[in-house]
Amino acid sequence: FITQPSLTKMVRELEKEMDIQIFERTNKGVHLSKDGEIFLGYARQVLEQADLLESRYKKKAGGKQEFTVSTQHYSFAVNAFVDLIKEYGGDTYDFSLQETQTYTIIDDVAHMRSEIGILYYNDFNKAVLHKIFKANDLEFRELFVAKPHVFLNSDHPLAGRKSVTMDELAPYPYLSYIQGDHNAFYFSEEIFSTVVRSKNIRVTDRATLFNLLIGLNGYTVCSGVIDQKLNGASIIAVPLRKEGDMHIGLLTHKQTHLSRLGQAYVAALERYIKGLQG
């Protein structure tokens, strides 16, 4: 147990020692400063590394490894996460894989709640996203470039085509992921989000999207990367005849270095990407 005055004194001494202001204090209360957010991100990494050392060399009972990824809805991100846990999970761990909205991914990495983010940019949103990356001291590292595809139900009337056009898709419901309060086209997870469509359905998760694809003969525009082991054979990817590239990659904070688990996860991602390209 520690008293409030003692805690306040310790924080002020830490601020003095580190020569930074961790908290901003006003008559409305106390909140983290920008330097404070970065400091806590570093501190979190140090504590996690210390736990790993104790767990490895002192056989500390109950010591948990922690690791968090925020990502758009990509099956290869899940595949790599599975591999990471199988190889490094051990008996105790606390890992998080968050399939979430684009802005949340950026915010999670910027505030070091997630070590790694996974998202894409294209010619349309590149300038806006990279400006946000720079403002938040984030670094984007490209994993691969994907050509546009659509996900369809395997029984869809267009499923047998070698490729499809936007005009051919027009009669069918278009599905996309909700982007919450930041629903600008620049944050859309789907390329060609500015195209006007007569039938639109927005969802929050991949399972619902796939169920609606099957139930309504809908479609969504995507990278074309799908794993039948995870998603079954009822969803297929068909090339879309429309010019555009999706640059899919990793988002990390420039003020941190990847942990051992982060490095292992990136290696697992790269193995899957190599398999896609090979």
Residue ranges and their predicted role:
Residues 64-128:
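Central regulatory/effector-binding core of bacterial HTH transcription factors
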Residues 135-141, 146, 207-257:
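Beta-alpha-beta core module
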Residues 13-32:
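A short LG(V/I)-centered, amphipathic sequence patch enriched
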Residues 77-83, 122, 126, 166, ...:
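Secondary-structure junction motif
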Residues 61, 132-174:
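Flexible hinge/capping segments at coil-to-helix
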Residues 17-18, 39-61, 67-68, 265:
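Alpha-helical linker/hinge and terminal dimerization helices associated
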